Each structure stands twice: as C-alpha cells, then as structure tokens.
Amino acid sequence: LSNYYIIIRRFYSNLYGREGYLTWTLPASPHAIILSKFVGALVASLYCLFLLFLSGFITILVMGAVIGQDLSPVFSIIAEAFSHSIAYWIIVWWIFTTASGIFLFYVSIALGQLFQNRRGLKAILFFFLLCIVLSIIGTAVNPLKDSYAVGSALVYGNIDEFGPNFIPGLIYEVIKIVSMYFTIHYISKYKLNLQ
C-alpha cells in the first residue's frame, strides 16, 4: 500500500501540484515526462513484488531451520512450477496488470484535473468508476475465468496448454494501457490547468 501511495503522491505533486509549474517548463515533451513517471513507478512496483517473493523464500528457509525439517520438497515443487510455460505467462500477466494499474491511478488523477474545484475527490470518484467499468469488461477476457478449464489443466497435467488462454487478457491489458496513456497525454498537453 505504501508503494501505491508514493506512486500516486509523486505523480500528482510532480505534474499537477505545486511542482507542476516547474515540471511542465522543463525542455521535455509530455511523452517523456509521463513515461519517466510511469517507468519509475513500474520499476518500484516490480521491485516490491520481487521483495515480497524473496521474503517468502527467506521465511520458508527460516521455518525449515526452526522446526528442524528438510523443506527441500517445497523447493522442488517451486522449481517444477517454473518448468511449465504457464509460470512465464503468469509473470508476463503480472507485469502487464501492474502497468495497467499504474496507468489507472494516473488517468484517474488526470481526469480529476478537468474540474475547477475538488479535484482530488473527483479523481477518487473517477478511480472507482473506472475500476467498476474495467472490471466488468475484464471478466470477459480473464484467462482464469473458466474454473473447469483451470481444474482440468491441473488434474490432467496439461497445464502448458493453458498458457495461450492469457493472450486475450494480455491484448485487453495492452488496449487499456495505450488508451489510458493517450488520455493522460491529451489532458496533460491540451487541458492542463494548474491552480
């Protein structure tokens, strides 16, 4: 949660807050400014995700040492999971959904800037409205929506064949990312009104 708070706060204050006057007078295009904020946020989010998995790994090691049991079967299960292509599809899925989530925060803040007063409140309202609408649309292309197919893939061992089910979801995420990016760019370039 603190990572998201930092991402939101830095984007808002650097582009639409008091620092916005300085940011928009830099000799850089709006594309460069928005992409620099996005890349920084994406790297920070993926780093936090990596640290989460690393801490889980260390916790398993410490648990094994404390209880005095060999936890090598746990590591063999993890290694076996990464031998399937589905693990790589899930990693790519996480990267795209993380990027989409960051742009969702950014586009909500940008849409809130279209109003003269109570911009923060309107940004929060846009966030919840966009979450509802995008979630309804996203259920149609969610790769894990068919629980029978997931269960069958796990039971019968053909989990590698399940990977291509991620393609419609990834296309949807790319469409969301591109549309939100250009919405942010348009608002920042043509409708920017710093107060």
Predicted segment positions?
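Hydrophobic alpha-helical transmembrane segments of membrane proteins
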Residues: 1-19, 30-195
